């Protein structure tokens, strides 16, 4: 988004080319057949060959790390906004559908931090994932109004606005949302408020 805006503001197409090249490489190499994505791809800096595929902040390299999926949905929706290239929106839809159909997706649509984590339902939820998806859905609804994405986003926002996730005024360190997860494998930011969870929540409210 920043690179595309840089081209719009400066008239220099270099930023646009970098953005679309990165998006296309991600589209080609990050996704599995079911629409889920890896977190990190290591490339040979000289040849561009894929060396390793990782999920650094998820349960396992082949697991469905929830926030990574949310960023894929959100990010490729943004790519479509700027380029109007349908392949980006199609990927956002594929990843969204994978999440919605996953047997471990909770009924309130606030995902576990990793949908393949071993102790579900006794695993932490990640509110930042839900907020990010909700914000993306409100934008996706503009492009695919027949898919009911606005209503789906409303369902997520209703969950996030409930006492289970929305903090009481003046509590939770003055953050809005509780129960986000940074990186369980690294023992960092587990079941805490996160600034980007609040960001996506406020953005979703604004888009609504």
Q: What does each of the following model-derived ranges do?
A:
Residues 1-208:
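Glycan-recognition and catalytic cores of secretory/periplasmic carbohydrate-active enzymes
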